[in-house]
């Protein structure tokens, strides 16, 4: 299974250097947000993609498809995380069906 990354230029470069299989860079413009949405939908349909990483900022703009596979994880960009513990709990709950508690 492959890992795909959708993010801004800096995030994409970091994950490319870390060895992500497919990396796509987008700017924060209306045209690029449309391209991003199309690319995300394309990746969700592919059977060889197991994990999609997408920056939190872009998720706030385009939303996420309601799928159980591939796993879609939100990652912070260079400006830091917008979410936190609750978002991570929700990701785990959706991915494996277990609710994390303190």
Swiss-Prot record:
Component of the A-type ATP synthase that produces ATP from ADP in the presence of a proton gradient across the membrane. It is a peripheral membrane protein. It is found in: Cell membrane. The keyword GTP-binding does not apply. InterPro entries: ATPase_V1-cplx_f_g_su (IPR008218), ATPase_V1-cplx_fsu_bac/arc (IPR022944), ATPase_V1_fsu_sf (IPR036906). GO terms for cellular component: plasma membrane. Keywords: ATP synthesis, Cell membrane, Hydrogen ion transport, Ion transport, Membrane, Transport. Signal peptide: none annotated. This is A-type ATP synthase subunit F. One of its GO terms (biological process) is proton motive force-driven plasma membrane ATP synthesis. One of its GO terms (molecular function) is proton-transporting ATPase activity, rotational mechanism.
């Amino acid at each position: 299974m492959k890992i795909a990354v959708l993010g801004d230029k800096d995030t994409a470069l970091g994950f490319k250097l870390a060895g992500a299989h497919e990396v796509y860079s987008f700017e924060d413009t209306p045209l690029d947000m449309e391209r991003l949405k199309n690319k995300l939908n394309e990746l969700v349909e592919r059977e060889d993609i197991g994990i999609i990483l997408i920056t939190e900022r872009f998720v706030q703009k385009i939303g996420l498809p309601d799928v159980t596979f591939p796993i879609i994880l939100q990652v912070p960009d260079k400006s830091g995380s917008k979410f936190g513990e609750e978002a991570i709990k929700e990701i785990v709950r959706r991915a494996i069906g277990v609710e994390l508690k303190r």
